[in-house]
C-alpha cells in the first residue's frame, strides 16, 4: 500500500513540477526539434521553417547543404513535429497533417515544392 501511495505521489509531483512523464523516445509537439533530429525531420518535409536559416530573405537549408538557396516565401511553413511510439506527425498549422510510421517514413515534399523559388543572383 505504501509503494502504491509513493508511486502516485511521484506522478503527481512530476505533473506539478512540469517534469516530463513520457517514456524515452517520445517527442512532444514542437516547432524546434532537437538539433540531432533535424536530419530526420527535414528529410521528409523540407519546407518546415526550422529546416532553414534565413537572412535578408535568402535561405539555406540547415541539413542538406546541396539544396539550392531559396527566396523566403510561403514555401516555408511553420511546422510542429511530434513522435509518439512509432507515429511521427507534422502539423502544418492550417489543419493539414502528415502522419507516418517513424520506422517507414514517407516524404511529404512534393506539394510544397510547387511554391519554392530558387534564389538566383539576378534576384538581388
Swiss-Prot record:
One of its GO terms (cellular component) is host cell endoplasmic reticulum-Golgi intermediate compartment. Residues 1-18 form the signal peptide. Glycans are attached at residue 64. It holds the Pfam family v110. It comes from African swine fever virus (isolate Portugal/Lis 57/1957) (ASFV). The keyword DNA-binding does not apply. This is Protein MGF 110-4L. It is found in: Virion; Host endoplasmic reticulum-Golgi intermediate compartment. Causes the redistribution of lumenal ER protein to an enlarged ERGIC compartment. The keyword rRNA-binding does not apply. Keywords: Early protein, Glycoprotein, Signal, Virion. Its main location: virion.
